[in-house]
């Protein structure tokens, strides 16, 4: 199931659509790093600036896969 959530990053509200396992993983990563979900997504958003055509939801999925791969 795909879940759409609104997150505020850089004082701007944006929507992210992810499958449930990705939301669970994203929350686990934020919790383990002791930061908010919005802070983590903001970090991911800053990293994707090198690939501007990459959507934020895709960037989040790639971040999660790379996080667990390492």
Descriptions of predicted regions:
Residues 21-33, 43-50:
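Surface-exposed, Lys/Arg-rich phosphate-binding patches that contact polyanionic backbones
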Residues 30, 41, 64-68:
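Amphipathic alpha-helical interface segments used for dimerization/assembly
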Residues 36-39, 55:
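Alpha-helix N-cap and coil->helix boundary residues
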Residues 1-17:
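Short Lys/Arg-rich basic patches
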Residues 14-23, 35-37:
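Short amphipathic alpha-helix starts
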Residues 51-70:
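C-terminal structural segments of small proteins and small subunits
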């Amino acid at each position: 199931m795909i879940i759409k959530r609104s997150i505020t990053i850089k004082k701007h509200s944006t929507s992210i659509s992810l499958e449930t396992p990705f939301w669970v993983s994203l929350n686990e990563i934020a919790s383990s790093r002791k930061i908010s979900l919005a802070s983590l997504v903001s970090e991911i958003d800053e990293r994707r600036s090198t690939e501007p055509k990459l959507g934020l939801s895709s960037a989040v999925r790639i971040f999660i896969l790379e996080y667990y791969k390492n």
